Amino acid sequence: LLGGGGLLQVATSALCLTYYLSVLRLARLFRKRVVVFNQSLGPLSPWGERRVRKALQGVPVILRDQDSLEYARRLGIPAALGADPALLLPPPPVPREEDLVLVIPRAGVQEEALTTLYVAANRLVHEGKQVLVLLLQPGYDDEVAEVFRLHRIERTSDPRRLLYLAAQAGYVISMRLHGLILAAAAGTPFAALSYDPKVAAFAKETGAYYQ
């Protein structure tokens, strides 16, 4: 089972794609059943497209967004449309604080995107909102903490804590896909700053604002 994530892409590295396709190939060599479940697809180089097309021949493929499904069809890969299983998580029974805005940045993005998010956070504070900056990858996101040092910051890699805060907040602004997914699971309005096609694809699927 190759499940839940954006593994079939070269944005991280071609080596990453090679690794996951090798896992699929080994599984088939040992006559194991293989399923691609709720993945996104792309971006891929022409080389990556050829490798993925070959690796997925005869494999059941379920993709988690419409853009990935259309991409698969252009590549001649039969696939069905699913959704991220995290959307099925029940939100905790926590009172909603309408003035609380959860801001979820990400390290490793263009400085312009972080600046946009920082300016938005400052403006929300000026308008009387409570802004909580949530860092979901402690260590990796430390450079982001410096950018938002004047704001309240919490670090966690626990999805249960993220879901709790998303359910508590009145609004979520996220650069990270799972910040958006758990906001949707909690029924909290959200907006996306897209660093990756999968983020824009999810926002588009749900009718949320994104840029």
Residue ranges and their predicted role:
Residues 1-211:
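Active-site anion-handling motifs in enzyme catalytic cores
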